[in-house]
């Protein structure tokens, strides 16, 4: 069996609220995470909400990394979806944790596009 992509979902709790509200810092974290997993960056776009919170996405040749933050709750939700054998989405986690400093990180690992003998598995 083969998979077309790997998707990790991160639940980050107890993060530093200042980091969660730092738009330039989040942009830098996304770029560093892309480098860490070996992906190819196309662009990064972030948006700062009022009074707080940041949403961002790094668009990759191999898919995307996204983040949504709630500084008032110390929480961030992230998706790292990659295609291709050379990209390792789990290698983004140390870069993300270094910047956000969560007390707890939950990781869900999903295999996307499972193919069995050259055909899509139903």
Swiss-Prot record:
The record marks 62-63 as: Cleavage (non-hydrolytic). One of its GO terms (molecular function) is adenosylmethionine decarboxylase activity. One of its GO terms (cellular component) is cytosol. Is synthesized initially as an inactive proenzyme. Formation of the active enzyme involves a self-maturation process in which the active site pyruvoyl group is generated from an internal serine residue via an autocatalytic post-translational modification. Two non-identical subunits are generated from the proenzyme in this reaction, and the pyruvate is formed at the N-terminus of the alpha chain, which is derived from the carboxyl end of the proenzyme. Its cofactor is pyruvate. One of its GO terms (biological process) is spermidine biosynthetic process. Binds 1 pyruvoyl group covalently per subunit. The modification Pyruvic acid (Ser) is found at residue 63. It catalyses: S-adenosyl-L-methionine + H(+) = S-adenosyl 3-(methylsulfanyl)propylamine + CO2. Belongs to the prokaryotic AdoMetDC family. Type 1 subfamily. This is S-adenosylmethionine decarboxylase proenzyme.
């Amino acid at each position: 069996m083969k998979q077309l992509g790997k998707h990790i979902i991160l639940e980050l709790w107890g993060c530093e609220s200042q980091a969660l509200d730092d738009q330039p810092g989040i942009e830098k974290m996304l770029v560093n995470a892309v480098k860490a997993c070996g992906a190819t960056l196309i662009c990064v776009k972030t948006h700062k909400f009022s009074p707080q919170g940041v949403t961002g996405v790094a668009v990759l040749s191999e898919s995307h990394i996204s983040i949504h933050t709630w500084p008032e709750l110390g929480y961030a939700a992230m998706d790292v979806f990659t295609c291709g054998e050379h990209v390792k989405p789990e290698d983004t986690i140390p870069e993300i944790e270094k910047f956000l400093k969560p007390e707890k990180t939950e990781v869900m690992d999903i295999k996307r596009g499972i193919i069995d003998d050259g055909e899509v598995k139903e």
